[in-house]
Amino acid sequence: MSQKRIAVIAGDGIGKEVMPEGIRVMDAAARQFGIDLKFDHFDFSSWDYYEKHGKMLPDDWKDQIGGHDAIYFGAVGWPDKIPDHISLWGSLLMFRREFDQYINLRPARLMPGIIAPVVRRDGTPRQPGEIDMYIVRENTEEIGRAHV
């Protein structure tokens, strides 16, 4: 069984709350499929890091996380403490640009047992399999256009 290394960056706010549960889910799935996961935790991209260092990321951030198989990122932004342009430009958009994460791909499927808010023309509910699509969003340009 090969090991997969995951860089874990909780960030701020809800990220710190949900990351432990997300890791539990990944661990359970990995056991089910015979995958060995190793989680490396990083404290940057957070208010705490910014308060101590005056920036969101260390100079060698890409070297620290670049060799991992995946990055598991919680949340960025705490407008009461750090202006959005600093937290976004200082971390999240850096990750997206440096690792060429230009697409935000979101599957949308109607699952069994879920009543869809989208109905047929006659008003009857849609059934599983009738809604199966992907939403594709550009992940780096919207906010970053003025800074290119």
Roles of regions detected by a PLM:
Residues 1-13, 31, 46-147:
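Anion-binding alpha/beta catalytic cores of soluble intermediary-metabolism enzymes, centered on
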